[in-house]
Structures are given as structure tokens and as C-alpha cells.
């Protein structure tokens, strides 16, 4: 039969489901978590593979969801991730299509699992990296693991999980230095960079509107560094507004053409046409 649609009271139809499959993480990013003393959910409280599959089945077969994104915590911390991906990939929409399955990850351990995840039906990955400078990365994440993340990305590319999208949180102290370097490096490596405005997450009382580097400021920093940007807009109601970057030179180095995105959830919220919903790990 024709699926029912999941429509909220504002008339927004849900097409995109975010499944958080764990609250655990192996990094301790300063804007997200305290350095220590975190209480994780007891394992029996986390949704099981069967429960996640059942939720996915209802969403895809009966409610018209077309895209599923697995998030955490860090989803690679679940040993049954391949099983979860395989079960969700086997679902079919009412039109007979496989749902698009994506993973948001910090990339640690991805090199060992990328091929298996691809074989299980994973379509693409978003990797969270706020800096490609090892010391800077260690200061942000409180873990010296950048080399492992880069190995993880190489594994994902080898497995055919292209294009690689990189998510970076923009914070005021370092945006002028960090953002242009990160964009130049991502363009050279063929990765699609998305800056994310710093949202009120993480330890209580640690967020203030002073911490937000808005989309206009990010663009200004990039243009001042020498990048030529042309607005593309927000394709398919996705959260990221995109700009085309012309090939040229910035920071004294050549770079190829590409795109850069900004997810401006604080300064330019896109709630009115949002088509996603989230289920937490418990």
C-alpha cells in the first residue's frame, strides 16, 4: 500500500531519520564533553540491533523515510555496526528503493571496517575533523589521534565511500587561522568541507552565543584568505548551505575547485523546511 507520511503539526514531511546508536565516544572534544566523569547509559538501555532494525523498517516501509544516518556518540564503538547497516540496507521504500545509509563518525578505527561497512550497504560517511594540524587536533579532542583518523579516511576512500564529507565546528578563538587552512587542505584532498556553527550542546553552562561564529563571519574569513566563493544555496532542503570554490590560490598555495558548506543552525536556522527526525540511543 501507499505509505503513510510522517508529517508534523507545521506541515513538514519527514524523509530523513537520524538514528543515534550509542552515547559512547572515544574522543573528548572540548565543546561536546567534559574531560572526564561521564556516566554512559548502561548497555542494556541501548537500542539493540533488532530494535534499531524494527524502527528503521517502520520508518522506511510505512512512513516514507528515504535516508537513514547513523550517529552517536561514536557509532564505530558498536561492534554490531555492520549488522545494523546490513539490516537497514535490506529495507525497501514503497517505491522499491534502498534507503540511503550514511554514517557520521570521528573516523577512529574506520580503516579496519570501511570495506565491511561498504559491503553491508553503507553509502557514504561524514567525518568530524576540526583541524588537520596534529597538535591543534589533540587540543580540541583531548586525544592525539589525527594520524589514525587520516588512515580511517584513506580506508573509506579505498572502500568506495565517496565523496568524503568533513564536518568541522567553527569556534571564535581559532576560526581565522583554522578555517582557511582546513578548506585548502580539503580541496586538495578532494573532500567536501562543511563548517558547523557551534550549537548549545555539551557540558551544561559551557555554551554562550559569544561562542558562535556565524555563517557571514566564516565566509568573510575565507574570502579574506583568498578563496573565491559563489553561493549555490541549500540543495534538497539539506542543512548545509553550499558555496562553489573556484580553483585558484589561497594562503600562498594553489588549490583545485570544489565546494564548501556551512550548517548555520544558530544564525540562519532552517527549521521551517527541515525534513529530518532523530531517535536517541536509548
How should each PLM-predicted stretch be described?
Residues 1-18, 28-30, 61-63, 242, ...:
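N-terminal [4Fe-4S]-dependent radical SAM core
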Residues 10-49:
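Canonical Radical SAM [4Fe-4S] cluster-binding loop centered on the CxxxCxxC motif
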Residues 13, 18, 31, 67-69, ...:
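Residue-level recognition of specific faces of alpha-helices
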Residues 16, 20, 69, 102-104, ...:
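Conserved beta-strand segments that form the floor/walls of ligand-binding pockets within enzyme
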Residues 37-42, 133-140, 202-206:
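A short acidic, helix-capping loop that chelates divalent metal ions and anchors anionic groups
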Residues 46-49, 53-69, 78-196:
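Radical SAM/AdoMet-radical enzyme domain recognition
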Residues 201-282:
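Accessory C-terminal segments flanking Radical SAM cores
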Amino acid at each position: 500500500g501507499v505509505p503513510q507520511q510522517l508529517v508534523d503539526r507545521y506541515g513538514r514531511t519527514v524523509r530523513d531519520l537520524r538514528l543515534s546508536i550509542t552515547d559512547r565516544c572515544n574522543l573528548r572534544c572540548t565543546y561536546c564533553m567534559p574531560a572526564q566523569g561521564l556516566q554512559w547509559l548502561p548497555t542494556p538501555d541501548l537500542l539493540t540491533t533488532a530494535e534499531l532494525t524494527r524502527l528503521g523498517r517502520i520508518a522506511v516501509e510505512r512512513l516514507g523515510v528515504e535516508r537513514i544516518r547513523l550517529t552517536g556518540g561514536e557509532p564505530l564503538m558498536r561492534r554490531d555496526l555492520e549488522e545494523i547497516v546490513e539490516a537497514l540496507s535490506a529495507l525497501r521504500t514503497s517505491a522499491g528503493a534502498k534507503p540511503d545509509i550514511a554514517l557520521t563518525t570521528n573516523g577512529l578505527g574506520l580503516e579496519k571496517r570501511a570495506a565491511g561497512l561498504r559491503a553491508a550497504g553503507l553509502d557514504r560517511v561524514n567525518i568530524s575533523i576540526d583541524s588537520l594540524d596534529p597538535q591543534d587536533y589533540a587540543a580540541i579532542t583531548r586525544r592525539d589521534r589525527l594520524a589514525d583518523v587520516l588512515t580511517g579516511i584513506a580506508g573509506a576512500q579505498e572502500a568506495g565511500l565517496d565523496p568524503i564529507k568533513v564536518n568541522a565546528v567553527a569556534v571564535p578563538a581559532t576560526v581565522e587561522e583554522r578555517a582557511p587552512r582546513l578548506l585548502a587542505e580539503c580541496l586538495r584532498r578532494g573532500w567536501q568541507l562543511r563548517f558547523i556553527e557551534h550549537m548549545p550542546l555539551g557540558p551544561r553552562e559551557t555554551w554562550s552565543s559569544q561562542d558562535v561564529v556565524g555563517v557571514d563571519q566564516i565566509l568573510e574569513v575565507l574570502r579574506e584568505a583568498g578563496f573565491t566563493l559563489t553561493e549555490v544555496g541549500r540543495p534538497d532542503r539539506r542543512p548545509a548551505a553550499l558555496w562553489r570554490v573556484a580553483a585558484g590560490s589561497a594562503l600562498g598555495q594553489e588549490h583545485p575547485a570544489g565546494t564548501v558548506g556551512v550548517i548555520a543552525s544558530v544564525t540562519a536556522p532552517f527549521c521551517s523546511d527541515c525534513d529530518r527526525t532523530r531517535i536517541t540511543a536509548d
